[in-house]
Amino acid sequence: IKILAFLKKSCQNYLHLSESESYLDEEIHTNKITVISATSNKGYAGGNNIGIKYALQSNDCKYIWVLNNDTEVESNSLSLLVSEMERDKEIGILGSKLVYYHNKNVIQGLGGKYLPWRFLTQHIASNHLITSKYDNDTISKQIDYIIGAALFVKAEVFKTVGLLDEQYFLYFEELDICLRARKHNYKLKTITDSIVYHKEGATISKEKNAFSEYHYLRSNKLFIRKFYPQTLFLYNMMLIAKIANRVRRGQFDLAKANLKVLLGIKYVNSKT
């Protein structure tokens, strides 16, 4: 409902894609709403690709805004992104200033870096006060990727480098698409005046569990194999150390999840 109100206020022409029909019944007949029902949980990449493929069928589609289901935006957030994309034709993917929804004085991130020899992702300006001032160009030189909760992508990018990689079920999809875009000489940039509030928890439970740990580690391994294969041996050694540490702490579910990543065994969860 909130995203519909935003679209009506901010855009003359829009296409809203959703997996749920329940709250859209009265809007569908306006001819501005298209509802797509997924047959199964395909994860972040697979689910978003359904909508992206549909949008790309239209010759009028210039940009695609991928937003998590646990985000809310300011009324001018989209227009700022469109203006910057129109101004600089070399930009392929834009990000917004992500702010914690439940603590709107604190920044979640302005983009991210990947530390390949430590196998870690790191959000830039994480936990800084929202009143902190940042230069868009300076921040953009520091980032390796746009945070996946809010990706504003030129349609041309998907046509050139391909869709989100569905090998990843959760995590690292945005790193993958951003690295592929950069290899094709598209620029990444964060527009810090464009604000997106992220509840960070509606998509994935905040509680650390075997399911989320498995997918984070598995996706990290897939990403390493694809872009940093020289570090794969060290990553596997790190997994062995993590397994031993989980066992030592009595965290046997997490140890089992780590072991499955190491051995390449699929994690089966009744909720997916």
Which ranges hold each PLM region?
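Acidic metal-phosphate-binding loop of nucleotide-sugar-dependent transferases
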Residues: K42, D70-E72, Y168
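Active-site acidic Asp-centered loop
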Residues: A38, L67-N69, D165
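Non-catalytic, C-terminal membrane-associated alpha-helical segments of glycosyltransferases
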Residues: A210-K221, R225-T272
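A short, conserved alpha-helix in the catalytic core of glycosyltransferases
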Residues: D144-I195
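Acidic donor-binding segment of Leloir-type glycosyltransferases
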Residues: I1-S40, I50, Y54-S58
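Short beta-strand-to-loop acidic/aromatic patch adjacent to the donor-nucleotide binding site
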Residues: D60-E72
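Acidic/His-rich active-site region of diverse nucleotide-sugar glycosyltransferases
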Residues: A5-F6, S10, H16, H29, ...
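Short glycine/serine/threonine-enriched helix-capping/active-site loop
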Residues: V66, I93-K97, I191, K199
